[in-house]
Amino acid sequence: MNDKIIEFINNNRLLSLAMQDNDGVYIANAFYAFDILNKALIIASSPNSKHVRLATKAPNIAINIAKDNKVPLLKGLQIKAIFEKANEKQKKIYFAKFAFARLMNAEFYALRIYFAKFTNNILGQKIYFENKNIII
């Protein structure tokens, strides 16, 4: 994964994730921590939330992380990922970034990235990442 993508992920903390719904698509927001070794975004949520129920049923999801609303300064990351339960190491990564999460009654999930497109209008280019080791 390109260093510019890693830096962008590490410098942000809120993502939007989209998943399939009976009526089309559904979207939710979540704070995240980054598991760089496994190229996964870690989130906390209730297992009863609509987005977790939908993503558990159809784990191929889309993610957006964006910054700034001025076109010349626009930076954003469009991601395709697999939704799965987080492991113990990933929970620790999340707690390191969001200590308050220890007080939450939540489950933790890993959004394992298999494709990413980073747009940075300042650079005037797009940077891609693809993990062909993940079977969809």
Task: State what each model feature region is.
Residues 19-21, 66-68, 104-109:
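A short, aromatic/hydrophobic, helix- or strand-capping loop or linear motif
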Residues 1-3, 45-51, 93-94:
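Charged, amphipathic alpha-helical segments
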Residues 9, 54-55, 94:
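A generic structural signal for nonpolar/aromatic side chains embedded in well-ordered alpha-helices
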Residues 73-136:
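Charged, gly/pro-rich active-site loop segments
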Residues 1-15:
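Extreme N-terminal tail/first-helix region
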Residues 35, 46, 66, 84-86, ...:
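Solvent-exposed residues in well-ordered beta-strands and their adjoining turns
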Residues 12-47, 55, 61-65:
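Short beta-strand segments
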Residues 51-80:
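Helix-adjacent hinge/juxtasegments
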